[in-house]
């Protein structure tokens, strides 16, 4: 049986990165763990990250050391990720194939730390990731 062990990350698009960062940090106490002019990753809990993307900043694929993060933008398509146990990686692959879900991309962040990406019926980018993608300490 496959299982979801939590929401690892949730993303939104913002027009003013600094204003949004101040809002989420001050209002909720989220701590910024990484980012640049294009994005910011905020720690929500020890196992949850809230991502802010500058509107238009994710229209092109993003090359990262372990692979490619597919494009996703603010015109209706959102991105969110679910954490899955590393031991269930193959079971999830099989489950997605069984339901004719095309995997758009995979990223190998580190040994046994992986993400796979696919689209939901509305085109939202869904990520399944094993633990360890984000250092939330």
Pin down the residues of each PLM region.
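Glyoxalase I/VOC metalloenzyme domain signal
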Residues: 1-7, 14-33, 44-103, 119-137
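Short, small/polar residue-rich loop motifs at catalytic or cofactor-binding pockets
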Residues: 36, 111-113
């Amino acid at each position: 049986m496959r299982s979801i062990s939590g929401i690892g990350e949730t993303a939104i698009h913002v027009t003013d990165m600094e204003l949004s960062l101040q809002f989420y940090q001050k209002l909720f106490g989220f701590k910024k763990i990484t980012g640049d002019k294009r994005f910011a990753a905020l720690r929500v809990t020890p196992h949850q990250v809230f991502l802010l993307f500058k509107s238009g900043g994710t229209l092109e694929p993003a090359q990262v050391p372990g692979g490619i993060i597919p494009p996703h933008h603010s015109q209706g398509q959102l991105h969110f990720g679910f954490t899955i146990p590393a031991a269930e990686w193959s079971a999830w692959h099989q489950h997605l194939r069984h339901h004719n879900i095309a995997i758009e991309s995979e990223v190998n962040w580190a040994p046994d730390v992986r993400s796979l990406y696919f689209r939901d019926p509305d085109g939202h980018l869904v990520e399944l990731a094993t633990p360890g993608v984000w250092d939330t300490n």
